[in-house]
Amino acid sequence: MSRGATARLFVALDLPADVREQLSRWGRAVAATPGPLPALRVLEPQSLHLTLCFLGSRPVAEIDALAAALERCSQPLGELAVGAPLLLPPRRPRSLAVAIGDPAGTLQSLHGSLLVALSEVSGWEPDRRRLRPHITVARMRSGARGGVEAPALPVPTPQLTFTPDALALYRSWLEPAGARYEEIARCELVPELG
């Protein structure tokens, strides 16, 4: 790659395979149910993740430093819970997601550590809004967007709890069929002792 090459990057929690499968199955059930939602394109299970920081287009030369920053942020996470369905963003929704509960507050702590560490090793300026943890399960087809209210869905969200064990730096490509992700660095989260 040339010296000025860039990559579209984000940091996310990897999800256990069974959680990805159940959420994808739920998304397919919602998409197949007639109702108030427009046409949905359900994401493949391997594409599901919990984004913590979207870095945007960054110089490829920063990737090693960003990966090292992930390692420095490794900390135990408490149990997370799948919550209510969300249409995001609320005013002009483009995606169907599920809220993620963080009763112990460990996800917020990890997010804060990442904001500091990632901005210290790059020119990235973080968005200082509080993290609103969610997992995007489906995208609305472009012709069907706009003005959709969050309906009561006939298919309840799965009652799932999980404890993530890895944090990853991903590269994404925007393609006509949807975003494609490549994991380029991975950090195992330190397990809680006790």
Can you annotate each of these PLM segments?
Residues M1-G194:
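Histidine-dependent nucleotide/RNA phosphoesterase domain, centered on the 2H-phosphoesterase fold
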